Amino acid sequence: MPQFRDPNEKRDFMLNTPIPRLVPKMALPSIAGMLVTSAYNLADTLFVSQLGTDATGAVGVNGSIDLIIMMAGSLLAVGAASLTSRLLGAKQDERAREVLSTCFFLALALGTLVLILGFTYQNKILLLLGANEEILPYSEQYCRYILLAAPFMATSFVLNQCLRAEGSAVFSMIGMVAGAVLNVGLDPLFIFTFGWGVAGASAATAISKLVSWCILMTPYFRKKTLLTIRFRQFRPRWSDAKEICAMGSASFFRNGLGTLAGILLNRIAVGYGTSALAAINVANRITMFMTSACLGFGQGFQPVAGFSWGAKRFDRVRESFRFSMIACVAGISAVALVVGIFARPILLLFTEDDAELVRIGVFSLRIQCLAMPFHGFGIIVNMLCSGIGRALPSLLLGLARQGICFFPILPLMVRLWGVWGIASVQGAADMLVMLLAVPIAVRVSRDIRRREAEQGGEISPV
């Protein structure tokens, strides 16, 4: 994707490039970055699985730590991205820079708070997340280095989202890919060559996150972006805070509910044995590879919608939504079909002698593959609402997948089908999300058409 120094050139690119060319140009770097990141998470699990089922379960438990850190950054990151893209579209560049700087330093503070609390209450937190006596020692080793990286991880979310928001998706991709490739290279070195075991996997991840953060900061230091990060631009405003929290709350609660859902699944699954716990987490890691593709496409579409909405180009909002919906749902359906067919060979990569892990994992993975088209639809509708500043629909969809549609059916499915209910609950929840996503999509689409028919009536761009 071309890079621009002149703000007017970038606006022209965002507002006049044909949608079938613009959305893929914006989405492909995001998809690549998200897929590579998911791949190294998967590789991390694959390498650790060579240490045994207990170690694999420990990595699954610590996945909730990652989500807690993500919560710290996503509230600010998603809200800042939505607001800055609309501000840039409306040519309010200086205010957009102040929004980014404010959110960056607040995310740094939140990440530091997670680090301090995590080390202070480490054992209690890990037990709460679902660790048992068998996997607690591994969980403690893995948790240590991840917590040290928390401030960099939290601020990386802000950097990533705001780079995409201004159309600089390539910079975002480079940072994510470089960190992922480094992690895959360091994992076998630290785990096996140095003999550090689970702690080696954690150290590799922490170092990779730090390197990724440095790369994401580079375009801001070299002034290759429309936005800048300066402490003198740290200017909290109540009006901006309300807007950022309103838009970021969807991601915040989604990650919060994802953390809670993961904790509940871990605590219930461990009652059926360590193999069941490991199977659920391995299947979820593989599924994350597919959901990341959906999310990456949505993150490419969101700034297109935001820029167009801020510039009152409602025809482009409508066209980009339609194009993105068709492309995302069709693409993820094809990928899910392939993964579902080869589910068993994929699970066998993670264990050679644990038949129970493979049996439960294959079932869970195939159920989630069936639900992928529904998930893709929900992601695009959510990104549309986020991009154009529709906080309430965005929040509802953010709460749906691992909240509104998840928690009510979890106890019922566990009661009826035991471990098989646990294995299929996420797929069932994804299907139920459609009950919210379809009416929201219809209502928002009607409003876009109305504004388009009125030739962009008087509205606030932010």
Q: At which residue positions do the language-model features occur?
A:
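Hydrophobic transmembrane alpha-helices of multi-pass small-molecule transporters
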Residues: I68-M71, N183-P188, W213-M217, F289-S292, ...
